[in-house]
Amino acid sequence: MTELSITGQQVMPPPACTPPEPFRITTNAPHQMNDASLTPGRRKLQKWLGRVLRIVITDGRVLVGFFNCTDRDANIVLSMCAEYLVEGQEPRLLGNVMVPGQHIVSLSIDEPDPQSSLLVQ
């Protein structure tokens, strides 16, 4: 099916919108790594990837965003991060943020585990 543009030329309609793909985890780790070769701590971190974390830092600010990665110094990278200065105030949207491990006071998962919920039909 074609449509006419303002100039009278025939144009194809845009393709149907498709829902976004689910969160995809990428890694540069060797492919032979499997779940059995991971330490319990690394296994837990892997489960947290893509989840929403709430991090309180030393100056009292609260950062909430999607957990992307960490390193050996406990630095954490969050995407789509929001900063909360005072409870009840509007958050400030920051985007991608690297939180130094030395400034992290507490860290928590801010959403329920999607795999732990049961769907009833």
UniProtKB/Swiss-Prot annotation:
One Pfam family matching this protein: LSM
Domain of life where this protein originates: Eukaryota
Span of domain Sm: 40-113
Recorded GO CC terms: NatC complex; nucleus
Cellular compartments annotated: Cytoplasm; Nucleus
Protein keywords: Cytoplasm, Nucleus
Subunit (UniProt): Component of the N-terminal acetyltransferase C (NatC) complex, which is composed of Naa35, Sbat/Naa38 and Naa30A. Interacts with Smn and Hez; along with Hez and Vlet, may form an accessory subcomplex involved in SMN complex function.
Role description: Auxiliary component of the N-terminal acetyltransferase C (NatC) complex which catalyzes acetylation of N-terminal methionine residues. May have an accessory function in the survival motor neuron (SMN) complex.
Entry-linked PANTHER family: N-ALPHA-ACETYLTRANSFERASE 38, NATC AUXILIARY SUBUNIT, SMALL NUCLEAR RIBONUCLEOPROTEIN-ASSOCIATED PROTEIN B AND N
Family: Belongs to the snRNP Sm proteins family.
Protein name: N-alpha-acetyltransferase 38, NatC auxiliary subunit
